[in-house]
């Protein structure tokens, strides 16, 4: 069931006064769900929970994190055809694309589970000391990758599964030991809620700390800006336009404590339809373009 609410840790919440609806581009109508935008209080609560969860989650073994990631994949798979139907109603994309993208997403989660289970990602390096070296002794140098802290992930418009709520950015952050706050994309917020429910359920089943995952809704830029500026957020993952990514980068750089923005940015590719082709083959062109 789609509630239209935000996930603040493992709790559904709808404190905001603003609601919006997603759009079905195939039927050219609004979808029925009322999505509630996150309030400032909910933004703060999600960030605080993530920071608190980080204290525990950062120390959890790779084996336990792998169990969590695999449980997420299993729970998403268990959502079955209903998830695919909601995906198509918000994206207009056909069932075949939905199934393919879901499969890709499950594969990403399970691949990161195997990677974190092996432990090679920490890239440990030990350069032992040589105190007897002349003219200066050599110091002992040791290096290892460690989690940064809570990561903010922005859902992408064109990949509701693979680059959004449980997509590659989320899987990578969780594998590294970083709690995740997702700013859902307003074009597929209901799909995001269903996937969020799977993540929250997986977290509960595998004993993860409350706040390891949150999902916040917004149709504008305010919630995203608040999250990027929040001192408890330590990194940002973004897939989208150059303009949007640059704006987030600038916000992150202007913080008292600047944070990294890992962004895949691109432009809109022009598609030219000539009048004769549009008159004769409009439906088939639209299906090919969407699929």
Predicted regions located by residue number:
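N-terminal Rossmann-like NAD(P)+-binding subdomain of aldehyde/semialdehyde dehydrogenases
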Residues: 1-136
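Residue-level signal for inorganic ion chemistry
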Residues: 28-29, 65, 87, 177, ...
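Hydrophobic packing residues within well-ordered alpha-helices of enzyme cores
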Residues: 109, 192-195, 227, 248
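Conserved small-residue-rich beta-alpha loop and adjacent elements
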Residues: 123-206
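A structured beta-alpha segment of the ubiquitous adenosine-cofactor-binding alpha/beta core
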Residues: 140-141, 214-237
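Short, surface-exposed connector motifs at secondary-structure boundaries
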Residues: 176-181, 207-210, 228-235
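General beta-strand structural signal in soluble alpha/beta enzymes
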Residues: 182, 215, 238-240, 261-264
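ALDH superfamily catalytic-core signature
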Residues: 198-201, 244-291
């Amino acid at each position: 069931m789609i509630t239209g609410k935000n996930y603040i840790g493992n709790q559904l919440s709808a404190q905001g006064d603003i609601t919006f609806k997603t759009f079905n581009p195939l039927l050219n109508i609004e979808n029925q769900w009322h999505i509630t935008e996150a309030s400032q209080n909910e933004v703060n609560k999600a960030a605080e929970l993530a920071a608190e969860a980080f204290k525990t989650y950062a120390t959890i073994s790779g084996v336990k994190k792998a169990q969590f990631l695999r449980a997420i994949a299993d729970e998403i798979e268990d959502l079955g055809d209903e998830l695919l139907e909601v995906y198509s109603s918000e994206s207009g994309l056909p069932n075949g694309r939905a199934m393919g993208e879901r499969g890709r997403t499950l594969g990403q989660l399970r691949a990161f589970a195997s990677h974190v289970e092996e432990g090679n990602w920490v890239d440990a390096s030990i350069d032992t000391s040589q105190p007897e070296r002349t003219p200066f002794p050599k110091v002992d140098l040791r290096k290892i990758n460690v989690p940064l802290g809570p990561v903010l992930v922005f859902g992408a418009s064109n990949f509701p599964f693979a680059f959004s709520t449980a997509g590659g950015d989320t899987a990578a952050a969780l594998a590294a030991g970083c709690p995740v706050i997702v700013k859902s994309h307003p074009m597929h917020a209901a799909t995001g809620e269903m996937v969020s429910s799977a993540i929250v359920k997986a977290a509960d089943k595998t004993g993860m700390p409350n706040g390891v995952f949150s999902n916040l809704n917004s149709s504008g830029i305010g919630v995203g800006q608040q999250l990027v500026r929040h001192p408890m957020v330590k990194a940002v993952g973004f897939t989208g336009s150059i303009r949007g990514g640059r704006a987030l980068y600038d916000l992150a750089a202007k913080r008292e404590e600047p944070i990294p923005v890992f962004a895949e940015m691109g432009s809109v590719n022009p598609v030219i339809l000539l009048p004769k082709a549009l008159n004769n083959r409009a439906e088939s062109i639209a299906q090919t373009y969407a699929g």
